[in-house]
């Protein structure tokens, strides 16, 4: 094969897509990662997994790159005399200083996989609002097509206030990262997604991993009815105003739901 033909093959190669999994503590990010990993193995999908949680006791999925192999979370606590959250933040910042090496590995092996999944610390602010988290997501976005998966706890989102709080936080992450963001409603095996579907219109569904529904909030009538059932007048009024203010965010924001098998 001559050099021109070789360069044409390289130029036609599809770059792997990065999905950064974030969400509040307890929303099931790592469990979802484990199910994604299992699905990829069962379906023969070429995927690469990265763990960025330095404090996790054990990773329930096969991580190709693990921050714990580079940074010792407990030693960071001792050396810098930090608490748990401070040590997580510092560990992530230390790892970020070497993340260009991770990018180099991913670029060299880019033809070996189609998807890259990145699990983040349980404390969402440690990644989304830290210098280390910003460095990592910017390096990934500069090298590969990158999307943020914002995981929400479906049972807790039955509360209209919690639902609105999650959407506000998702909007702030979208605004700060400037990356495509998909809201994923997790734990639908515990609480069905029907209540959220009633708050949405133009619903389209498709099978992705377990169950995924792409939705766009285009009509707030059902959400307004749910607000009417709340007893706190101040919160009801605030949520009603916020739902209208954020109309443009809802209108074009893809929402997914998933459950464990």
Language model: regions and residue ranges:
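N-terminal regions of ATP-driven nucleic-acid and macromolecular assemblies
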Residues: 2-8, 16, 54, 73-81, ...
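Cofactor-binding loop segments of dinucleotide-utilizing enzymes, especially the Rossmann-like FAD-
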Residues: 24, 52, 151-153, 186, ...
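Conserved catalytic-core segment of NTP-binding enzymes
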Residues: 125-248
């Amino acid at each position: 094969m001559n050099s021109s033909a070789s360069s044409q093959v390289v130029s036609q190669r599809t770059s792997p897509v990065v999905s950064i999994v974030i969400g509040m503590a307890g929303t099931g990010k790592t469990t979802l990662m484990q199910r994604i990993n299992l699905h990829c193995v069962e379906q023969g999908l070429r995927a690469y997994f990265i763990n960025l949680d330095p404090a996790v006791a054990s990773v329930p999925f096969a991580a190709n790159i693990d921050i714990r192999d580079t940074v010792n979370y407990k030693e960071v606590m001792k050396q810098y005399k930090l608490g748990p959250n401070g040590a997580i933040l510092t560990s992530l910042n230390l790892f970020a200083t070497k993340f260009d090496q991770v990018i180099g590995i991913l670029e060299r092996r880019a033809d070996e996989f189609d998807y890259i999944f990145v699990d983040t610390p349980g404390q969402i602010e440690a990644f989304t609002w830290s210098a280390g988290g910003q460095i990592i997501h910017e390096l990934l976005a500069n090298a590969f097509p990158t999307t943020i998966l914002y995981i929400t706890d479906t049972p807790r989102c039955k509360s209209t206030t919690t639902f609105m709080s999650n959407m506000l936080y998702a909007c702030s992450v979208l605004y700060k990262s400037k990356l495509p963001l998909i809201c994923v409603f997790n734990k639908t095996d515990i609480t069905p997604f029907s209540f959220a579907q009633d708050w949405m219109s133009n619903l389209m569904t498709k099978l992705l991993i377990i169950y995924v529904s792409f939705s766009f909030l285009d009509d707030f009538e059902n959400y307004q009815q749910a607000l009417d059932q709340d007893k706190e007048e101040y919160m009801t009024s605030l949520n009603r105003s916020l739902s209208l203010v954020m109309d443009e965010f809802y209108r074009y924001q893809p929402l997914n739901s998933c459950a464990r098998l």
